[in-house]
């Protein structure tokens, strides 16, 4: 079930470029350019489903899980939040991407993906910090996490994971728990 906050409801289907109804579905996406000039790549339904299943297996999600999508669905990170909700058959809440997306929501979430800027802004507001602490599984990606941000997460007792991935790998393929001295990445189930 999709629930939209702060904007009109979103219906998943071909009109907005994402549907899991066809076996031959593929999306043309632009890579980020982190490994060279941005290029168009094609990602299939099968790849998106495999990524969502690997993440779900890693975090042991179930249909009772409650997700928050606070990333732009025009990019792989936001798209994959929608795919995860469909594959995991769970509730997802959508908020317009901003530096402090938790200021726009109430309630607790089981799975949230954020970029470091969003996490840093959440740490700086005491009310929002409590919401951040209540997230069961927080993944952080899209940019490097500074040592200061890592220290703030540990100091505040926030369990979070740094991701390793890119558009070409259909989101993350490995995760490292933040809080250990050295980040040790664990490859997702099903990734060779």
Q: Where would I find each of the regions flagged by the language model?
A:
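Conserved AMP-binding A3 loop
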Residues: 25-53, 60
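Conserved pre-ATP/AMP-binding loop-to-beta segment of ANL
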Residues: 12-30, 62-66
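AMP-binding/adenylate-forming
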Residues: 43-50, 66-121
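Short beta-strand->loop structural element characteristic of the AMP-binding/adenylate-forming
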Residues: 1-12, 39-42, 91-97
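Gly/Ser/Thr-rich phosphate-binding loop
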Residues: 126-181
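Conserved S/T- and glycine-rich ATP-binding loop of Class I adenylate-forming
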Residues: 31-34, 67, 82, 112, ...
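Nucleotide donor/acceptor-binding cores
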Residues: 39, 65, 136
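Glycine-rich helix-loop-beta junction characteristic of Rossmann-like nucleotide cofactor-binding loops
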Residues: 57-62, 128-131
């Amino acid at each position: 079930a999709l629930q939209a906050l702060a904007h009109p409801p979103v219906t998943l289907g071909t009109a907005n470029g994402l549907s899991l109804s066809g076996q031959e579905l593929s999306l043309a996406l632009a890579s980020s350019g982190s490994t060279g000039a941005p290029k168009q790549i094609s990602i299939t339904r099968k790849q998106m489903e495999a990524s969502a299943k690997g993440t779900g297996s890693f975090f042991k999600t179930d249909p009772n899980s409650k997700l928050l999508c606070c990333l732009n669905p025009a990019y792989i990170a936001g798209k994959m939040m929608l795919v995860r909700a469909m594959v995991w058959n769970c509730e997802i809440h959508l908020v317009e991407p901003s530096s402090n997306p938790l200021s726009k929501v109430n309630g607790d979430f089981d799975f949230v993906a954020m970029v470091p800027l969003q996490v840093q802004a959440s740490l700086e507001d005491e009310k929002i910090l409590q919401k951040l602490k209540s997230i069961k599984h927080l993944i952080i990606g899209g940019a490097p996490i500074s040592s200061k941000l890592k220290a703030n997460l540990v100091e505040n007792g926030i369990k979070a994971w740094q991701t390793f991935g890119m558009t070409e790998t259909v989101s993350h393929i490995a995760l490292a728990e933040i809080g250990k001295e050295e980040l040790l990445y664990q490859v997702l189930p099903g990734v060779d």
